[in-house]
Amino acid sequence: MWQFPALLFLFLPGCCTAQDPVTGPEEVSGQEQGSLTVQCRYDSGWKDYKKYWCRGAYWKSCEILVETDASEQLVKENRVSIRDDQTDFIFTVTMEDLRMSDADIYWCGITKAGTDPMFKVNVNIDPEISTTIMTTTATVLPSTVLTSTVLTSTVLTPTTPTTESIGTENIGQVTQNSLFIWSLLSSISFLLMVFVVVPLLLSMLSAVLWVNRPQRHYGGGEIGLVETHRSDALDGEKHFPGDEK
Protein backbone atom coordinates (compact mmCIF):
# COMPACT_ATOMS: atom_id res chain seq x y z
CA MET A 1 0.00 0.00 0.00
CA TRP A 2 2.96 2.42 0.64
CA GLN A 3 5.05 1.41 -2.38
CA PHE A 4 3.58 3.95 -4.81
CA PRO A 5 4.17 7.08 -2.62
CA ALA A 6 7.69 5.86 -1.89
CA LEU A 7 8.50 5.45 -5.57
CA LEU A 8 6.99 8.85 -6.33
CA PHE A 9 9.23 10.44 -3.70
CA LEU A 10 12.34 9.02 -5.37
CA PHE A 11 11.56 10.88 -8.60
CA LEU A 12 10.87 14.28 -7.07
CA PRO A 13 13.53 16.85 -8.04
CA GLY A 14 15.64 18.28 -5.24
CA CYS A 15 15.58 15.27 -2.95
CA CYS A 16 18.86 13.92 -1.59
CA THR A 17 18.81 10.19 -2.18
CA ALA A 18 21.25 7.75 -3.70
CA GLN A 19 19.02 7.39 -6.78
CA ASP A 20 19.21 11.12 -7.71
CA PRO A 21 21.10 11.74 -10.99
CA VAL A 22 22.42 15.03 -9.59
CA THR A 23 22.90 16.19 -5.99
CA GLY A 24 24.40 19.16 -4.17
CA PRO A 25 24.10 21.34 -1.07
CA GLU A 26 20.59 22.22 -0.05
CA GLU A 27 21.63 25.71 1.12
CA VAL A 28 24.64 27.98 0.62
CA SER A 29 25.44 31.50 1.86
CA GLY A 30 27.62 34.29 0.55
CA GLN A 31 28.48 37.84 1.58
CA GLU A 32 27.51 40.91 -0.39
CA GLN A 33 30.27 42.04 -2.79
CA GLY A 34 31.89 38.61 -2.31
CA SER A 35 31.52 35.28 -4.13
CA LEU A 36 30.20 31.77 -3.50
CA THR A 37 30.79 28.35 -5.04
CA VAL A 38 28.36 25.46 -5.45
CA GLN A 39 29.47 21.95 -6.39
CA CYS A 40 26.89 19.62 -7.90
CA ARG A 41 27.70 15.90 -8.17
CA TYR A 42 26.20 13.65 -10.85
CA ASP A 43 26.29 9.98 -11.81
CA SER A 44 28.95 8.83 -14.27
CA GLY A 45 26.29 8.06 -16.86
CA TRP A 46 25.67 11.81 -17.30
CA LYS A 47 29.27 12.63 -18.14
CA ASP A 48 28.70 13.70 -21.75
CA TYR A 49 25.57 15.76 -21.08
CA LYS A 50 25.31 19.53 -20.74
CA LYS A 51 25.08 20.88 -17.19
CA TYR A 52 23.53 24.19 -16.22
CA TRP A 53 22.67 26.54 -13.35
CA CYS A 54 19.22 28.11 -13.36
CA ARG A 55 17.24 30.46 -11.12
CA GLY A 56 13.60 30.33 -10.10
CA ALA A 57 11.30 28.90 -7.47
CA TYR A 58 9.65 26.47 -9.92
CA TRP A 59 11.98 23.99 -11.60
CA LYS A 60 10.03 23.82 -14.88
CA SER A 61 10.24 27.55 -15.54
CA CYS A 62 13.58 28.54 -13.99
CA GLU A 63 15.89 30.81 -16.00
CA ILE A 64 19.17 29.22 -17.12
CA LEU A 65 22.03 31.58 -16.22
CA VAL A 66 24.97 29.55 -17.54
CA GLU A 67 25.40 26.16 -19.28
CA THR A 68 28.34 23.96 -20.31
CA ASP A 69 28.92 22.71 -23.85
CA ALA A 70 29.21 19.06 -22.71
CA SER A 71 32.97 19.48 -22.25
CA GLU A 72 35.27 20.52 -19.41
CA GLN A 73 35.69 24.02 -20.86
CA LEU A 74 34.95 26.90 -18.48
CA VAL A 75 31.89 28.89 -19.49
CA LYS A 76 31.11 32.31 -17.99
CA GLU A 77 28.05 34.50 -18.39
CA ASN A 78 28.11 37.91 -16.67
CA ARG A 79 28.85 37.21 -12.99
CA VAL A 80 28.28 33.42 -13.12
CA SER A 81 30.66 30.73 -14.37
CA ILE A 82 30.44 26.91 -14.64
CA ARG A 83 33.04 24.17 -15.20
CA ASP A 84 32.45 20.43 -15.56
CA ASP A 85 34.98 18.02 -14.07
CA GLN A 86 34.23 14.84 -16.01
CA THR A 87 36.81 12.84 -14.06
CA ASP A 88 35.28 13.34 -10.61
CA PHE A 89 31.76 13.84 -12.07
CA ILE A 90 31.29 17.26 -10.43
CA PHE A 91 30.36 20.53 -12.05
CA THR A 92 31.18 23.71 -10.15
CA VAL A 93 29.20 26.94 -10.27
CA THR A 94 30.73 30.25 -9.09
CA MET A 95 28.77 33.46 -8.49
CA GLU A 96 30.85 36.65 -8.17
CA ASP A 97 30.21 40.23 -7.03
CA LEU A 98 27.21 39.09 -5.02
CA ARG A 99 24.28 41.39 -4.47
CA MET A 100 21.46 41.25 -1.96
CA SER A 101 19.05 40.67 -4.87
CA ASP A 102 20.91 37.43 -5.75
CA ALA A 103 19.26 35.66 -2.80
CA ASP A 104 16.83 33.16 -4.36
CA ILE A 105 16.20 29.52 -5.23
CA TYR A 106 18.56 27.99 -7.82
CA TRP A 107 18.85 24.58 -9.49
CA CYS A 108 21.70 22.31 -10.57
CA GLY A 109 20.46 20.74 -13.80
CA ILE A 110 21.43 18.34 -16.59
CA THR A 111 20.05 18.86 -20.08
CA LYS A 112 18.39 15.78 -21.60
CA ALA A 113 15.34 14.86 -23.60
CA GLY A 114 12.20 14.98 -21.53
CA THR A 115 12.40 16.06 -17.89
CA ASP A 116 15.84 17.29 -16.79
CA PRO A 117 17.43 15.88 -13.62
CA MET A 118 17.62 18.83 -11.20
CA PHE A 119 18.56 19.59 -7.63
CA LYS A 120 17.25 22.54 -5.60
CA VAL A 121 19.73 24.91 -3.87
CA ASN A 122 18.66 27.79 -1.62
CA VAL A 123 21.11 30.73 -1.87
CA ASN A 124 21.31 33.30 0.95
CA ILE A 125 23.22 36.61 0.77
CA ASP A 126 24.50 38.30 3.93
CA PRO A 127 24.92 42.10 3.95
CA GLU A 128 28.39 43.53 3.63
CA ILE A 129 30.10 44.44 6.92
CA SER A 130 31.06 48.10 6.79
CA THR A 131 34.14 49.32 8.64
CA THR A 132 33.97 52.75 10.25
CA ILE A 133 37.27 54.60 10.78
CA MET A 134 37.25 56.92 13.75
CA THR A 135 39.32 60.07 13.43
CA THR A 136 40.30 62.45 16.16
CA THR A 137 40.76 66.13 15.41
CA ALA A 138 42.32 68.67 17.72
CA THR A 139 40.84 72.15 17.98
CA VAL A 140 43.47 74.89 18.13
CA LEU A 141 42.53 78.30 19.49
CA PRO A 142 43.42 81.17 17.12
CA SER A 143 46.50 83.15 18.03
CA THR A 144 46.10 86.63 19.51
CA VAL A 145 47.84 89.34 17.49
CA LEU A 146 48.88 92.62 19.16
CA THR A 147 48.20 95.46 16.71
CA SER A 148 48.26 98.43 19.09
CA THR A 149 50.60 99.87 21.70
CA VAL A 150 47.73 100.23 24.16
CA LEU A 151 48.24 97.68 26.92
CA THR A 152 45.26 95.74 28.16
CA SER A 153 45.15 93.20 30.96
CA THR A 154 44.06 89.78 29.78
CA VAL A 155 43.10 86.92 32.04
CA LEU A 156 44.10 83.58 30.55
CA THR A 157 42.19 80.62 31.89
CA PRO A 158 43.95 77.42 30.76
CA THR A 159 41.79 74.42 30.18
CA THR A 160 42.99 71.08 31.44
CA PRO A 161 42.89 68.48 28.62
CA THR A 162 41.48 65.08 29.43
CA THR A 163 42.89 61.77 28.28
CA GLU A 164 39.62 60.95 26.54
CA SER A 165 39.69 63.97 24.23
CA ILE A 166 43.44 64.24 23.63
CA GLY A 167 45.43 61.31 22.34
CA THR A 168 49.11 60.72 22.07
CA GLU A 169 49.33 62.56 18.77
CA ASN A 170 47.79 65.73 20.32
CA ILE A 171 50.32 66.08 23.15
CA GLY A 172 52.75 67.88 20.84
CA GLN A 173 50.02 70.34 19.86
CA VAL A 174 49.23 71.08 23.53
CA THR A 175 52.93 71.67 24.19
CA GLN A 176 53.10 74.12 21.28
CA ASN A 177 50.08 75.99 22.67
CA SER A 178 51.77 76.23 26.09
CA LEU A 179 54.94 77.59 24.51
CA PHE A 180 52.89 80.13 22.57
CA ILE A 181 51.14 81.33 25.75
CA TRP A 182 54.50 81.63 27.53
CA SER A 183 55.93 83.59 24.58
CA LEU A 184 52.87 85.87 24.62
CA LEU A 185 53.28 86.58 28.34
CA SER A 186 56.99 87.32 27.81
CA SER A 187 56.10 89.77 25.04
CA ILE A 188 53.60 91.55 27.31
CA SER A 189 56.23 91.84 30.06
CA PHE A 190 58.71 93.29 27.58
CA LEU A 191 56.17 95.84 26.35
CA LEU A 192 55.38 96.83 29.94
CA MET A 193 59.06 97.42 30.59
CA VAL A 194 59.52 99.47 27.41
CA PHE A 195 56.42 101.64 27.62
CA VAL A 196 56.00 101.99 31.39
CA VAL A 197 59.15 101.25 33.35
CA VAL A 198 61.62 103.00 31.04
CA PRO A 199 59.62 106.27 30.77
CA LEU A 200 59.13 106.23 34.56
CA LEU A 201 62.87 105.87 35.15
CA LEU A 202 63.59 108.67 32.68
CA SER A 203 61.10 110.94 34.45
CA MET A 204 62.68 110.24 37.84
CA LEU A 205 66.16 110.89 36.45
CA SER A 206 65.02 114.20 34.95
CA ALA A 207 63.53 115.27 38.29
CA VAL A 208 66.76 114.48 40.14
CA LEU A 209 68.84 116.41 37.62
CA TRP A 210 66.49 119.36 37.88
CA VAL A 211 66.74 119.49 41.66
CA ASN A 212 70.55 119.21 41.66
CA ARG A 213 71.22 121.76 38.94
CA PRO A 214 73.93 124.54 39.75
CA GLN A 215 72.58 127.71 41.50
CA ARG A 216 73.70 131.07 39.99
CA HIS A 217 73.78 134.09 42.50
CA TYR A 218 73.38 137.46 40.89
CA GLY A 219 74.17 139.09 44.31
CA GLY A 220 72.39 142.41 44.16
CA GLY A 221 72.51 142.67 47.95
CA GLU A 222 76.19 141.75 48.27
CA ILE A 223 77.30 144.24 45.66
CA GLY A 224 75.46 147.05 47.39
CA LEU A 225 77.11 146.17 50.74
CA VAL A 226 80.61 146.19 49.24
CA GLU A 227 79.98 149.51 47.62
CA THR A 228 78.81 150.96 50.96
CA HIS A 229 81.94 149.77 52.77
CA ARG A 230 84.11 151.19 50.04
CA SER A 231 82.39 154.58 50.31
CA ASP A 232 82.95 154.65 54.08
CA ALA A 233 86.64 153.91 53.62
CA LEU A 234 87.06 156.68 51.14
CA ASP A 235 85.31 159.13 53.45
CA GLY A 236 87.73 158.23 56.24
CA GLU A 237 90.72 159.01 54.14
CA LYS A 238 89.54 162.55 53.28
CA HIS A 239 91.28 165.47 55.24
CA PHE A 240 89.39 168.56 56.06
CA PRO A 241 91.03 171.92 57.04
CA GLY A 242 89.55 171.97 60.46
CA ASP A 243 91.04 168.60 61.34
CA GLU A 244 94.70 169.69 60.94
CA LYS A 245 94.32 172.25 63.64
Curated annotation (Swiss-Prot):
Record key words, sorted: Cell membrane, Disulfide bond, Endosome, Immunity, Immunoglobulin domain, Lysosome, Membrane, Receptor, Signal, Transmembrane, Transmembrane helix
Keyword Signal carried by entry: yes
BP terms from Gene Ontology: positive regulation of protein ubiquitination; positive regulation of toll-like receptor 9 signaling pathway; toll-like receptor 9 signaling pathway
Protein name: CMRF35-like molecule 3
Subunit and partners: Interacts with FCER1G; the interaction may be indirect. Interacts with TLR9.
Main location: membrane
Inducers of expression: Down-regulated in macrophages by single-stranded CpG oligodeoxynucleotide stimulation.
Organism: Mus musculus (Mouse)
Gene name of the record: Cd300ld3
